[in-house]
């Protein structure tokens, strides 16, 4: 008698019908689906955020600081998505030097601290969040109107089409939602993300 945990292939052999549900379905789900049904309109009836391309030099520069300051001045929230822990630290220090309070979210933060940060976000005590992978999903804050993404065209697992769409979605709860993609060229993943978001905006 085999008494081991089923792997994915074992599961597929034992299941006749599977329903995949995802906001960002991968090639596997699409290729293995006989029928695909779209749900593009959001429950809050707000369109997906507008995508704006910024030069790579914008990230960490004076114009970015001004945009962050303008956004929080309206009582709204900014999410800054970095490419590395070093970049997170640099941006956190930069904001501090410009008298802008911010919090950092990363995988080492305990659940209680994460809940506290989310509570302070929704309560308006925190206006800027900086992170890497933790900003992809699960942070639904209606005050977030600006997402800034570092090196949006970089070719790695943090900048796939799916990840870019997920990070952009953090600004989808606010009617003023915008996403600044910082890059000096357009990668295929970034182009795909922009195309998908524009498609959704058109339908919404």
Q: Where are these predicted regions, by residue range?
A:
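A short beta-strand element within the Helicase C-terminal
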Residues: 130-152, 165, 178-180
